[in-house]
Design a protein with these regions (language model features):
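A short beta-loop-alpha structural element at the N-terminal edge
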Residues: 4-18
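Terminal substrate-recognition subdomain of acyl/acetyltransferases
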Residues: 163-173
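Short glycine/proline-centered loop/turn elements that form peptide/ligand docking sites
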Residues: 109, 113, 134-138, 155-160
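A short gly/proline-enriched turn/hairpin at secondary-structure junctions
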Residues: 27-41
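Conserved catalytic-core motifs of GNAT/GCN5-like acyltransferases
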Residues: 82, 128-132, 143, 148-165
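Conserved acetyl-CoA-binding loop-helix of GNAT-fold acetyltransferases
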Residues: 96-99, 105-119, 139-144
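Acetyl-CoA-dependent GNAT
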Residues: 21-24, 39-102, 113, 172-173
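Conserved GNAT acetyl-CoA-binding A-motif
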Residues: 120-130
Length: 173
């Protein structure tokens, strides 16, 4: 079993859709998972539009998009999207990552993050991300790669009847 990190392509959509849909199921069993979720799961059509727009942003040099592939199946993905192309924020990349539940704690997230950081150098000057304040595992990974916290938005997300604080982190490239 060899893990391969590569650029995302159109044929990855089915696996990416499966990963994103499994994320919705996980929110019910793990209230501290993720950053936020839409109240209603996105349709296949809406997800395809998001996916194609992200691939277009890659072609325009406004995003990087990678998948982690294990035995021919996408088990995780991450992207860095330019904060605001053509503006005074175009040097900032917004990082996002998702690793399938069955492939966590196997180094997939580390490899995706390391690859994204490496490829971001020279394209962006700053990476930033958001994470649930109580997500100690994700925050430890980000801190181990040099990310620093720059603030917390209390009660930023309301999930069912409870609130979750959102933490913001950045990395100077």
């Amino acid at each position: 079993m060899t893990l391969k990190i590569r650029s995302a392509v159109k044929k990855d959509f089915k696996d990416v859709l499966g990963l994103n849909r499994s994320m919705y199921a996980e929110f019910h069993s793990n209230p501290n998972f993720g950053d936020f979720v839409f109240l209603k799961q996105s349709s296949r059509q809406r997800m395809l539009k998001w996916f194609n727009t992200l691939l277009q942003d890659v072609r325009k040099d406004n995003a990087l998009y990678y998948v982690a592939e294990l035995d021919g199946k996408v088990v995780g993905h991450c992207f860095v999207r330019r904060e605001s192309p053509g503006s005074e924020l175009s040097h900032v990349g917004v990082f996002s990552i998702l690793v399938g539940k069955d492939h966590r704690k196997m180094g997939v997230g580390k490899k995706l993050l390391d690859h994204a950081i490496k490829e971001s150098r020279g394209r962006f000057e700053i990476l930033h991300l958001r994470v649930f304040k109580q997500n100690k595992i994700a925050k430890a990974l980000y801190k181990s790669r040099g990310f620093r916290s720059f603030g917390v938005a209390p009660k930023f997300i309301k999930r069912k009847n409870s609130y979750i604080d959102r933490e913001y982190m950045y990395l100077l490239l």
